[in-house]
Amino acid sequence: MKGELSLHICGCRGSRSVFGPEFTEFGGQTTCFVLKKANYALVLDCGTGLDNARDLLAGCSAVDVVVTHWHYDHVMGLMDWSVFPAGAKLRFFVSSDAYNLSFDALSQLFRHPFWPVDPTLRVVRQPVKWECPVSLRPGVKVTFLPAPHPDGSSVLDLSVFDKHICVLCDFEHNREFPEEILHNCDLLLYDGMYTDDEYPAHVNWGHSTWQEGCRLANRVEPARLLITHHEPRRTDSQLRALEQEAKKLFPAAAFARAGMKITF
């Protein structure tokens, strides 16, 4: 497949959307990332940031969607299915645990009298087993690993056209996690919702700290570290200041911003 591979940050706010002039640089819409090459797109989660993917998906003939879990901030973008090209081949991939909940969860979320549109999912009819690489198409593989998070979530270990990308979003740091899968990845996206000082009040909430992300990066040495899932009330100025502190701990660190594009 010709063309460059790029990652687009369509939403990187954690837990809920926020609005206002103090949230314009990093964005207030919730998790949605898009990997794109030529006329193919791989969508990672469908938070409210999915609407920002509309133009990216417009020319795609094939779209794969990976859903880490069914919490609102990762699926509310599915309120408007017109974001997906009408003629594109659309497939959804979820973990074996989430698969069993997929139809029930979405039918409960998008149903009368709360929402007038009943979305029809074209979900792959085979659940994806934990820790078993699945080929989505030639050159694209994903491995789901269980993430420490209330109700469960997934770490994504992705091989996309020879690039190794790991997504630890909605992830609480855990010594038992197999860090070896992350070694020397091209990009590590990490849940940095809290600071180390804030974390003790949020143990078992299913999220980590940007400092833990930097410590992990120093152990596994990714080419780039991107901190995401920003705390809802964290302003642009606060995030900029934390980003500078993160660079002191791991020079290749940055904080995700809505509209950011990373080319591999």
Predicted regions, residues:
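DG-centered beta-turn motif at the end of beta-strands
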Residues: 168-170
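Cap/insert and terminal regions of metallo-dependent hydrolase folds
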Residues: 172-259
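Binuclear metal-dependent hydrolase catalytic cores
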Residues: 1-166, 176-177, 240-264
